[in-house]
Amino acid sequence: MILTLTMNPAVDIGYTVETLKMDTVNRTQKVSKTPGGKGLNVSRVLKQLGSPVLATGLLGGHIGAFIKEKLDEVALENNFYPIQSETRNCIAILHEGLQTEILEAGPTITPEEQAGFLAHFETLLKEVDLITISGSLPSGMDEALYATIIEKATAVGVPVLLDTSGKTLKIALEASTKPALIKPNQEELAGLLGVPEATTV
């Protein structure tokens, strides 16, 4: 089984309007609300391909309950660790061929919740053959958390695929135990190497 980690999931809300007008009311008949986050996108694709997959991460509040409900509706197996703070929304407004996004920062995780999640993860680790880690960490979490997860998984022979960026990625790559694979885009790779992003004409 493949375990997917989404530590900072969201409800992706899409609003479609013909024209986005500033400083006034905009009305829409087209609204979509779906569980979001890179790891959940990975989970959906794996399920479509027929691979056994288990989604985990952090969920809290009414928004977290909505995400779990929607995953259960499509029989996407999940076992998230509960937190006190509310899971975030990410809003996309589609207008005039453009997309304007409003991204909430997300919850702040306590040290006790981080420790609880790691214990939860170690329980799930006994059931899986491969782990994917996708996306950012929420506020309050140790930036070395992914490195810790990679170390714990590798110690029991479970490879980890890592898709993140910034300092979290740098710490994971500088740790003694490395991920089996990383997936940086051009901008992330340039930042990791400390060089200007390449451009094409």
Predicted feature descriptions by range:
Residues 24, 48-128:
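Conserved N-terminal subdomain of the carbohydrate kinase-like
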Residues 5-7, 80, 132-133, 160-164, ...:
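General beta-strand structural signal in soluble alpha/beta enzymes
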Residues 1-56, 64-66:
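Glycine-rich phosphate/adenosyl-contacting loop at the front of the ribokinase-like
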Residues 147-201:
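Conserved phosphate/ATP/ADP-binding segment of small-molecule kinases
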Residues 110-149, 153:
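Hydrophobic alpha-helical segments and helix pairs
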Residues 5-9, 58-61, 83, 136, ...:
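Cofactor-binding loop segments of dinucleotide-utilizing enzymes, especially the Rossmann-like FAD-
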Residues 21-22, 72-74, 96-98, 176-182, ...:
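Short, hinge-like loop/turn segments at secondary-structure boundaries
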